[in-house]
Amino acid sequence: MIDFLMISTRSTKRGVIEIYPKFIIKKSSDLMIRGGDFYAIWLEDRGLWSTDEQDALQLIDWELDKYAEENRKNFDSSIKVLHMWDSESGMIDSWHKYCQKQMRDSFHMLDEKLIFSNTPTNKKDYASKRLNYPLEEGATDAWNKLMSTIYSEEERTKIEWAIGSIVCGESKKLQKFMVLYGAAGTGKSTVLNIVQQLFEGYYSVFDAKALGSSSNSFALEAFKTNPLVAIQHDGDLSRIEDNTRLNSLVSHELMTVNEKFKSTYANRFKCLLFMRTNKPVK
């Protein structure tokens, strides 16, 4: 059973035995709270964490039904399971109170390394997703033909170095910001589209202008999924008012994240930034 849950019973005036969830105040190894709300739950059957709260509700209901089935013969009266999916049971309100008011933040950032389709995982990997392909040797004829057509050998080496650093995990330590500059139609977006396909689920899009605006307190919300890659297809660094936040992001410094309708929390982002621009960087 998940370690933050206890199955309890009580009798009603009509003699019905109610089976309901009781949530334990503790530092759980199966549940994470971030920003004063639900963040993730461990799903043993998948071997992954999930940030979908519905998965948590379904898992709790499964535990309730399992308990009811295993102990049905021990009850003399009829039983009623108070499910999370039933809004009239009031259990969903108890859950929200537990996550949002009674528990304190306790979390480990998820997805800080790539998980390929052939990568074994456990709870301590803190992974919530997988890429849909394995990491193994193979032919790269199409890639070689494309890159030799649109980029010089020197520029191609830089791009492949950046991609390789993400695959091997070194990008989390690099204090680099990749800017693809050139005229329209020179293949900048082509490369970024390939990067997105390579790291599906591990990238997010960002707005450099928002990061450089001192008045935008929610600029880091674009990074709330803790991406390993952040991409802007059409950026303009000339409009940056204050580069402090951008520099801290590139340097992987500890930053305060302000998400809408949630409490602030601190995080050290591990992403490598890519930007396409038609304007020279000064």
Regions found by a protein language model. Give the residues of each.
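Short regulatory helix/loop adjacent to the ATP-binding pocket of P-loop NTPases
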Residues: P280-K282
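Alpha-helical scaffold elements adjacent to nucleotide-binding pockets in ATP/GTP-utilizing enzyme cores
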Residues: L59, E63, V191-I194, E241-L249, ...
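AAA+/SF3 P-loop NTPase mechanochemical coupling elements
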Residues: F218-T225, N258-R276
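Walker B catalytic acidic pair
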Residues: H233-G235
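Intein modules and their embedded homing endonuclease domains
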Residues: M1-Y126
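Structured core elements
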Residues: V179, A230-I231, L273-M275
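P-loop NTPase catalytic core of nucleic-acid-dependent motor ATPases
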Residues: L31-D55, F107-L228
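Conserved catalytic/switch belt of AAA+ P-loop NTPases
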Residues: E200, N243-Y265
